Amino acid sequence: LPGIEVPDTLAALGALAAGWRAQFQIPLIAVTGSNGKTTVTQMLASILHAWQGDAALATQGNFNNDIGLPLTLLRLRPVHRAAVVELGMNHLGEIAYLSGIAQPTVALVNNAQREHQEFMSSVEAVAHENGAVLSALKVDGVAVFPADDEHENIWRDLSDKRRQLLFSEH
């Protein structure tokens, strides 16, 4: 069987997906946060499907890690006009890595809660990790995050001069 030998199959999968994604100049929303990622992703997928029909791609289930995200992006086809993907994490640096693969045009941080404390030293560290998706945006990207969250300033700083859209319970 013909094949290509690579030293790291996960890195190769990520690089392949990033290269594939780069061929599609479409809006791509990346959703991250401690809680509610899948729900928000599916809500956005419903909106995109109402707008674009089958021309919208979305994460299925919670394919949100270094295997699932590349597999989702490799489903992109010329018919697609928009996409929404979920980014999950359980260790430092994972959101930045996944964001580099996804190349989002819109990044949404849902929240930061006490999760993965075995890998993250504090909830503030979780907020920084989740906010890495904002730093990955190009300068014309859109950063979306909660206005009434105690970590709002972290996300403002990470999104820097990019357009910011805030949401609130109040």
Please identify what each model-predicted range represents.
Residues L1-T32, T39-A45, H49-W51, I67, ...:
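Short, basic phosphate-binding NTP loop
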Residues L16, V31, L69, E86, ...:
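Residue-level signal for inorganic ion chemistry
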Residues H49, R77-P78, Q103, K138-V139, ...:
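Short conserved AdoMet
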Residues G53-I67, N111:
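Short beta-strand-centered segment that lines the nucleotide-binding/catalytic pocket of NTP-utilizing
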Residues T59, D66-A82:
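P-loop NTPase switch/communication element
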Residues R81-L92:
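Switch II (G3) loop of P-loop NTPases
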Residues N90-I101:
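Switch II of P-loop NTPase G domains
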Residues V106-H170:
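Acidic, Mg2+-coordinating active-site environments of NTP-dependent enzymes
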